[in-house]
Structures are given as structure tokens and as C-alpha cells.
């Protein structure tokens, strides 16, 4: 399984637009399709047109449940994005491992909204997942000092920073 914490397109790495970078990433992910599930938590450069000034994302055009046949055995839920559409921008995956037992991985979009946190909480507390170990995959969680991030300067709203994700 592959887990990545975002930064898929990045305006500081060359001369490609966000769309061109997503297309490049999509070609790379195609090599994994049908082989392993991959879980993407979008970062600050994955949302908005530049860097998290709004909640728009190109991800649903490139990463969706039918794309990778491995999602059929691991993707257990998708949450609504800011438009009210279920996408893999907020997604949950289940894995079973002899050593670790039952695992639920929840991937959040950068600075998740209250609705995404509520959706995840309901999953975690459900009868089906109540006894699972839970991994939360998100972007921009710890600062350089190792402390949870309490505030960032992005204009994105509504949103929750790391400390709010942790306490909710």
C-alpha cells in the first residue's frame, strides 16, 4: 500500500501548470493501478488554483474509485467534498494484517472542514470499525518543532488546522 501526504502539484518545482503536474502524476499512478491501493491526502498545493485560497481540486478528475481495481477491496467510504459530492478527497480504506490486525486509514483533504471530521468520527465510532486501529493521513500536521500546527496563513475557509483535527 502507498500512502502520500500531498504536495502532488507544486508551483515551485518547474514550469508545469497544476493540471500538467496532475497528468504526470496520473501517468505514474497508472503503473500502480491493479497492483496496490494508493491513498492520497491532498496538501496545500493540491487545493485552490495556487495554494489553498479556495477548496477547488483537480484530484477527482484523476483519482476516483473505479480507476484502480485494488480500491474494490480496500476503499470502504468516501466523504463529501465542499460541493457535496462524494469523492476520494476525503476517503477511508480498510486493511487486514496478521501482525497489525484490522486497520482503518482515513485520508483528509488539506485543512479538513467540520463535515469531513464529523464523517470520519462517525466511521470510527461505527460498529464495523470500532475495534480497528486508525491511521489518519493528512497534510501539514506537525511543525518543525514537532508540535501540532495551530494556525496557518492560508485563506482557505472553512477549515481546521492540525490541533483542531486532533481534538475533534
Q: How does the language model describe each region?
A:
Residues 4, 37-39, 147-149:
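Predominantly extracellular/lumenal beta-strand repeat domains
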Residues 9-119, 128-129:
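Extended active-site neighborhood of metal-dependent phosphoesterases/phosphodiesterases
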Amino acid at each position: 500500500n502507498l500512502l502520500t501526504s500531498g504536495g502532488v502539484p507544486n508551483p515551485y518545482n518547474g514550469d508545469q501548470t497544476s493540471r500538467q503536474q496532475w497528468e504526470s502524476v496520473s501517468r505514474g499512478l497508472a503503473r500502480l493501478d491493479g497492483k496496490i491501493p494508493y491513498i492520497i491526502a491532498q496538501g496545500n498545493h493540491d487545493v485552490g488554483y495556487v495554494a489553498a485560497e479556495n477548496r477547488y481540486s483537480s484530484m477527482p478528475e484523476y483519482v476516483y474509485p473505479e480507476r484502480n481495481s485494488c480500491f474494490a477491496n480496500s476503499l470502504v467510504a468516501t466523504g463529501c467534498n465542499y460541493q457535496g459530492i462524494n469523492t476520494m478527497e476525503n476517503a477511508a480504506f480498510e486493511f487486514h494484517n496478521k501482525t497489525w490486525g484490522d486497520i482503518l486509514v482515513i485520508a483528509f483533504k488539506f485543512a479538513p472542514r467540520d463535515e469531513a471530521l464529523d464523517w470520519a468520527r462517525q466511521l470510527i465510532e461505527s460498529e464495523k470499525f470500532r475495534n480497528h486501529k486508525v491511521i489518519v493521513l493528512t497534510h501539514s500536521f506537525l511543525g518543525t518543532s514537532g508540535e501540532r500546527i495551530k494556525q496557518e496563513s492560508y485563506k482557505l475557509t472553512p477549515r481546521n488546522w492540525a490541533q483542531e483535527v486532533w481534538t475533534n
